[in-house]
Amino acid sequence: MTKFDHHFDYVKISLASPSKIRSWGERTLPNGQIVGEVTKPETINYRTLKPEMDGLFCERIFGPVKDWECHCGKYKRFRYKGVVCERCGVEVTESKVRRHRMAYIELAAPVTHVWYLKGTTSYIALALDLTVKDLEKIVYFHSYVVINPGNYHKLNYKQLLEGYEWRNLEEKLSSHSSNIFGIEVGIGAEAIYKLLDNINLQNTVEILREESLRPPKLFKNPSTKFNKKMKRLRLLENFLATGANPSWMVLSVIPVIPPDLRPMVQLDGGRFATADLNEFYRRIINRNNRLARLKAILAPEIIIRNEKRMLQEAVDSLMDNGRRGRTVIGANNRPLKSLSDIIEGKQGRFRQNLLGKRVDYSGRSVIVVGPNLKLHQCGLPKEMALELFQPFVIHRLILQGLVNNIKAAKKIIQRNEVVVWTVLQEVIYGHPVLLNRAPTLHRLGIQAFEPILVEGRAIKLHPLVCPAFNADFDGDQMAVHVPLSLEAQAEARLLMLAPHNFLSPATGQPILMPSQDMVLGCYYLTTYNPAAISDSSHYFSNLDDALMAYQQNNITLHSLVWVRFSGLVNDSSNQMVISSKLNIDGTITKIFSDRIVKYDNDGQMVVQYIRTTAGRILFNKAIRESLL
């Protein structure tokens, strides 16, 4: 790993100037020679299988292919470390420098950066206050643009001219009687470069700030023009704040990434497989060299212009293949991967390699429903648990004196001896694990559970925590992480355990709510059969007797029965007495719709029967047991 001499607080991404890009790749050799510019499209010599000098894999620019050995073989071994071969100019050093040494291509004509030209917001168009359509006409050589109108009153600054309009104007300018002078008209990225370079950031920002103080009268619905001015003001202020020049959005130097990040490998049949980026760089160098040659021989303007357009398209495809124009495809009709394709998306450099690193003590498997689990539990497959907790198991085996060393412990683990599962059960007791389902969109996307060993290879998940994870059981996968330190375990238990996260952080509403089959089951258990209302002639002395009658099939789950109940009944909604009866012993029996109550002479309740079903008794019993 590279060690930095200087500490830093943050990384800032900003526009790079042409001199900055050159400084990334330029190095001065001890003999005073400056290397870093790639001028040849060749990669390797197919006869010697060595990189071509000044090519895309040049050892003089990027460093040696073999450790401590120069290109020509004059210097070999570590003792020549730091020596630069006077014959081939290669520095004797480690080959891993080819992973970070860069180079550059000096362009014969400037080109625009496609990200700033054709992005979601075209920053070049915004900076110049032009439409994207007009900008593309200029860049791709369809229209001319006025850079300086001179003293000709019919021309305006940044006005677009078609080819025939410019030819007519040229005829006027070339005539001897013409008194028009100072006109400057351009086309292509060179014209855009001049327009961007002409922007006086300080003055333009001050003018836009004054205009921002006088917004349109309909302030609630500002015009599109006003919004665009505000966006332009923000952009130019950012240029001022970062010290960047808008003209840097037009490239005159292309950086070349290190060769080991775009490798070329030999296959079994003698053929070579190469990274797609090499093809893009090769096209750019070929077109660039051809353009330089055409300029040198003073070729006609139309030919040079066509070559500039082709160079622009080659650079566009390197930056973002297919963003504009025809997609460059490889030998097997597959679109070549550009720099944007390598960086962006789920499989890109950021999400796949930088944010999505593999970590130890973690696993992944399909989830299945575990309705018999407690809310704070999850079912962990035995094989996975043994692999995740292996260091803990080995430590416990040695502590208990069952083995003497780690090697012996690993052997009995491989043999799946019974003692291993006993020790594993002891190890996981009280040790929470973290379950995570991607994408983790809020803090409830990762929660802690106590693991329960289960057979099979699927992780069992309590159905009530599914809404928090946005999980379902149609093939979803979840990751398991083991908190190792005592601090991490305590945090998982106190803050991240599933029962501690039953409110949604977004709304404050409960997120652990029964749904679907649970609601249907509760409804089915507590409903009654309307047809059996007239046949509710069964009386039971207590709740257990009613359940026993249900188990012996004397009553159904939904049959209405009368059960003696001594507890408090909250039935304020139905207090209307249907009938009242005076008994021989002086007691009074009052019959309500769902209760029969017997009172003594003093008005005290003697006995109470409630009308219910076996299903409701079961439901009440389950809730009561869970609360106790």
UniProtKB/Swiss-Prot annotation:
GO biological process terms on file: DNA-templated transcription
Residues that bind Mg(2+): D472, D474, D476
Residues given in the record as Zn(2+) binding sites: C70, C72, C85, C88
Swiss-Prot/TrEMBL cofactor(s): Mg(2+); Zn(2+)
Keyword Transcription on entry: yes
The UniProt record lists the keyword Transport: no
A GO term for molecular function: zinc ion binding
Family annotation (SUPFAM superfamilies): beta and beta-prime subunits of DNA dependent RNA-polymerase
Main subcellular location: plastid
Cellular component GO terms held in the UniProt record: chloroplast; DNA-directed RNA polymerase complex; mitochondrion
Parts of the chain that traverse the membrane: none
Cofactor stoichiometry and binding remark: Binds 1 Mg(2+) ion per subunit.
Pfam families xrefs: RNA_pol_Rpb1_1 (PF04997), RNA_pol_Rpb1_2 (PF00623), RNA_pol_Rpb1_3 (PF04983)
Alphabetic keyword roster: Chloroplast, DNA-directed RNA polymerase, Magnesium, Metal-binding, Nucleotidyltransferase, Plastid, Transcription, Transferase, Zinc
UniProt subcellular location: Plastid, Chloroplast
Enzyme Commission code(s) on record: 2.7.7.6
Catalytic activities: RNA(n) + a ribonucleoside 5'-triphosphate = RNA(n+1) + diphosphate
Protein family (similarity comment): Belongs to the RNA polymerase beta' chain family. RpoC1 subfamily.
Complex formation: In plastids the minimal PEP RNA polymerase catalytic core is composed of four subunits: alpha, beta, beta', and beta''. When a (nuclear-encoded) sigma factor is associated with the core the holoenzyme is formed, which can initiate transcription.
Function: DNA-dependent RNA polymerase catalyzes the transcription of DNA into RNA using the four ribonucleoside triphosphates as substrates.
Annotated protein name in UniProt: DNA-directed RNA polymerase subunit beta'
